[in-house]
A protein has these predicted regions:
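Catalytic or ion-translocation cores adjacent to nucleophile or general acid/base/metal-coordination motifs
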Residues: 264-293, 501-676
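Structured alpha-helical segments in the cores of large, soluble enzyme domains
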Residues: 136, 141, 146-149, 153, ...
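Core mixed alpha/beta domains of very large multi-subunit molecular machines
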Residues: 195, 199, 408, 416-538, ...
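Acidic, glycine-enriched catalytic cores built around paired aspartates
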Residues: 2-5, 14-17, 23-25, 54-78, ...
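Short, flexible loop/turn elements at secondary-structure junctions
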Residues: 80, 252-258, 393, 400, ...
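Glycine- and acidic
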Residues: 1-5, 58, 196-215, 266, ...
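Often metal-dependent polyanion-binding catalytic scaffolds in large enzymes
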Residues: 1-434, 460, 509, 599, ...
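Hydrophobic alpha-helical packing residues
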Residues: 20, 225, 229, 366, ...
Length: 893
């Protein structure tokens, strides 16, 4: 039987389901509604183990005409999205309810952490200083797994607001009736809206979604979060946080990530940079209008009078008039540039300090005038926002693949008659690059580097030069890091520095190598040691460096366990090398939502990093759909800001213990075995690629307009050419979840069979890293379903070789589950995580029909294509809806 979920959540799920049912009856007819209810009843029976119910369900879908598949698919997809809405709102409701109950545990992890610090005798001075020094940066990326349209997301937010209104205790009957009517209207509107985009979003569209997240939730959540943090600091450290505090900041890859995305050009990057500054100016302009309205008071300091030039009846309004006009001028100038027009920039705000200084003067004046309650109102929120978001709203990272930079340098060396840079030894490359970086003369004549100078190189190379020229024209504060994907050698870093020098970038972007494959992770520390040993480079970095750890590609390359351990070791080695050279290292974690892309609950994920690797500073990507789940609602955004802050503080001040030598030895042994098993299947089995493309919707995923990036790095090729994210997504759709467990279960089982379980038990009890690894494995295994995977296979192929492989994979999945249960001494998965277990049980009756429908839709579509028929719109549309619905139902897998 299904365990009972919290009553308020259950009521919300039921309410949304009932209103969806009423909407279906009204707009799609009683017959469809009856059919959906029949399917739901059969799916519940199948969930509870009734084999006959599942057979009836399968037969029903086989007999349905094409045109009836779409409304059925949409109905079940909508319900899963509504379940997500109800769960997200329940998190916000639970936080609020806890504040009413003095005996309840605080939902803020910082409250518990401060108590822990006190128990562990962390001094208040040390704690205060560490909070002031925090540097957490969350980097928003638009990876193609956010399948929901922005239009629908807005409607989901409106539904959430309706649930909040209905939760109010003192609604009159009429108010409640109106709230229900509004909720039904939103659900009806969602049903009447196409959930699938007609066109792929452009990189500019993606960037605008990032700006919308800031405007709709984080703009208010950030100052509220800092206020709460300050209250805790006052209570525990008896001090106030400084005005310049910004423990969490935000950056973006949207419009800057050109790795494998030909749609991100230098023109697009320039447009996004201008748009970002325009959005910031627009938001600040609204704030300053509100602030001037509030600051009608007369009392002010001598400093304020001097700044105005003479006494004034409304000094603050008068003083802020100039800042308001500058914000208007800034917004106007950016609007003109976005339209391709020139404009006067003499009054444009070009740095954060230009905006901040007038606000700080107002703050000092109010404090001097004995008006702290006004100083600490809207004005303080404004100051917090400027410190967090700057004049750029989101700093833009630039990312490009290392090979492009090598090609660009090669084009230069060949033009100069020096030969092909790419064919040189690594030492020769380093010598040349360092020599040119130290030289005061340019490497090329100036006209070669002009926009019209297309004298050297392939168009791809010219685009690298054009991007560098674009970066040279930006205010330094608008830009973040320059990420080199697929970084392998020290010369990869030096090449980007030389290209920046040649473009005349006065304030070079910090260059961040991204180590992604197993081989590159293993060599990361050696690469950085070589760089730190270079006198010129050591002077250039001025004691600070950032390195990015890739999760997605390493897991696709070696499997989850081997990649995870390689990432851990790389971080340990990088931390040690940086310490040896006196360099302050910031690790940038390229995590996603799925566990094979580094996904894990934030607090667990950060606390399980190697001791010393998080020293008050961290960067983390927030990818695709996770942005909405973590920051789509103000209350949830607040919670995630608290979690990131608590996790970073704890990992810094109370780092986990060093793993014992025997634990390391066992991990090395397990990962060696794991990668062999993984690669034997993925690389060496001749039928594997065909199985992936036949049984999963990998090919169909390419037709879904998910993101601006192509699903493949190259048009042709096998697994190695497939991007890591569609690779994970395809296996998730059929519930095999293969990237997350293949090889891992076999490796653990081998160790248990060798009488090593006692050591594993010790690791599970005492080592946060291993605890997190096993917890994540259990979570993903709980969402896997071998029977559903078998249904796809039996429905989509008659190939005996593929069936043999499928049997092997499902047996490995079964073995992995049994191994995990043995390791944890449990009889069922998620015994210690009832919340997730209940959530999945509620979703099963809606997920099962979507899977069966999807398999049938894939078969019909392929049959039509085999018969050379044109695209079959009802089938294509329904298939895309099924992909979106399953993604919504499974969320972070």
């Amino acid at each position: 039987m299904v365990q009972q979920i919290d009553a308020p959540l259950r009521e919300d799920v039921r309410l949304l389901g009932n209103l969806l049912g009423e909407t279906l009856k009204q707009h799609a007819g009683q017959e469809l509604f009856n059919q959906i209810e029949q399917i739901r009843a059969l799916a519940k029976g199948a969930r509870d183990g009734q084999a006959e119910a599942e057979k009836q369900l399968e037969q029903l879908f086989l007999e349905l005409p094409d045109e009836e598949l779409l409304p059925l698919t949409r109905a079940f997809s909508h319900f899963l999205n509504f379940a997500n809405i109800a769960e997200q709102y329940h998190v916000v409701r639970s936080r609020r309810q806890a504040e009413f109950d003095p005996d309840a545990n605080s939902p803020n992890p910082l409250v518990h952490l401060f108590k822990k610090f006190k128990d562990k005798n962390i001094s208040t001075e040390k704690l205060f200083q560490q909070i002031c020094d925090l540097k957490i940066e969350l980097v928003l990326t638009a990876h193609p797994t956010e399948v929901s349209r922005r239009t629908l997301i807005q409607k989901y937010d409106d539904i959430n607001a309706c649930l909040s209104q209905l939760d109010q205790q003192k609604l009159t009957p009429r108010e409640r009736q109106n709230a229900l009517a509004n909720l039904k209207q939103q659900i009806s509107s969602a049903w009447q809206t196409d959930e699938i985009r007609q066109h792929r979003p452009t990189p500019v569209d993606e960037a605008k979604w990032g700006f919308a997240t800031i405007e709709q939730t984080l703009w208010n959540a950030v100052p509220k979060f800092i206020r709460e943090l300050n209250e805790l600091v006052q209570d525990n450290c008896q001090q106030n946080l400084p005005l310049h505090i910004a423990p969490v900041r935000f950056a973006s890859w949207m419009g800057g990530d050109r790795d494998g995305n030909p749609n991100v050009t230098h023109q697009i990057t320039q447009e996004v940079l201008w748009l970002s500054r325009w959005q910031a100016a627009d938001l600040y302009l609204r704030d300053i209008e509100n602030l001037r309205w509030e600051l009608s008071i007369q009392s002010c300091s001598e400093e304020m009078v001097e700044a105005i030039g003479s006494p004034h009846p409304e000094p603050y309004r008068e003083y802020l008039r100039a800042t308001r006009e500058r914000l208007k001028a800034t917004r106007h100038w950016l609007a003109q540039r976005l339209q391709g027009l020139e404009a006067d920039d003499s009054n444009v705000i070009k740095s954060k300090d230009e905006l901040l200084q007038p606000l700080l003067l107002c703050y000092r004046s109010l404090i001097d005038s004995n008006l702290p309650e006004i100083a600490n109102g809207q004005l303080l929120d404004f100051i917090y926002r400027v410190n967090c978001f700057g004049i750029e709203l989101l700093k833009l990272d630039i990312r490009q693949e290392s090979g492009r930079h090598r090609q660009a340098i090669s084009a230069i060396t060949e033009y100069l008659g020096l030969g092909n840079f790419e064919s040189w030894t690594e030492q020769a490359r380093q010598n040349f690059l360092i020599q040119e970086l130290q030289s005061k003369r340019p490497l090329l004549p100036k006209y070669i580097n002009e926009p019209e100078g297309s004298l050297i190189g392939h168009p791809d190379v010219q685009e690298v030069f054009a991007t560098m020229r674009t970066l040279a024209d930006q205010p330094p504060e608008s830009l973040g890091a320059y990420i080199i994907s697929m970084a392998e050698y020290p010369s990869d870093v030096l090449a980007v520095l030389l290209l920046q020098k040649e473009a005349g970038i006065q304030h070079p972007l910090r260059v961040v190598p991204l180590f992604e494959t197993l081989k590159d992770l293993d060599g990361a520390a050696t690469t950085m040691n070589t760089l730190f040993n270079m006198h010129w480079y050591k002077q250039h970095i001025q004691g600070k460096h950032e390195v990015m750890i890739g999760y997605s590609d390493s897991a696709k390359d070696a499997g989850f366990m081997s990649a995870n351990w390689a990432q851990y070791r790389a971080q340990e080695e990088l931390t040690a090398i940086a310490r040896k050279h006196g360099v302050q290292l910031t690790l940038f974690h390229g995590r996603g939502g799925s566990i094979s892309r580094g996904g894990a609950p934030t607090q667990q994920a950060l606390f399980s990093q190697p001791p010393g690797s998080i020293s008050g500073a961290i960067r983390v990507t927030e990818q695709g759909e996770m942005i909405r789940f973590k920051f789509g609602l103000e209350g949830i955004a607040m919670q995630n800001l608290e979690i990131y802050t608590a996790a970073t503080l704890e990992a810094t001040l109370l780092p986990p213990p060093e793993p014992k030598a025997e634990w390391r030895e066992l991990m090395n042994r397990m990962t060696d075995h794991s990668v062999k098993v993984y690669r034997q299947t993925v690389r060496e089995n001749p039928h594997f690629v065909k199985y992936l493309r036949t049984v999963t919707p990998e090919l169909e995923l390419q037709m879904l307009p998910l993101g601006s990036r192509p699903a493949k790095r190259k048009v042709s090729g096998g697994i190695e050419s497939l991007r890591a994210i569609p690779w994970v997504f395809a296996w998730t759709q059929i519930r095999l979840m293969l990237p997350a467990w293949l090889g891992t279960g076999a490796a653990i089982n081998e160790v248990i069979a060798d009488q090593q379980k006692a050591t594993l038990d010790e690791m599970l009890q005492q080592w946060p890293y291993f605890q997190t690894l096993i917890d994540m494995l259990e979570m993903v295994l709980s969402k896997a379903d071998a029977n559903i995977a078998l249904y796809y296979e039996s429905h989509l192929t008659e190939d005996e070789d593929l069936k043999v492989l499928g049997n092997q994979l499902r047996q490995r999945l079964k073995d992995a589950v049994e191994t995990l249960l043995t390791l944890k001494d449990e009889s069922k998965l998620l015994s210690d995580n009832e919340v997730l277990d209940q959530s999945m049980q509620v979703r099963k009756p809606y997920l099962l029909p979507l899977h069966l429908l999807q398999a049938e839709l894939m078969k019909r579509r392929r049959d039509y294509l085999a018969e050379r028929q044109a695209e079959h719109t009802p089938v294509d549309h329904a298939l895309m809806v099924s992909i979106a619905g399953i993604a919504a139902g499974l969320r972070n897998t």
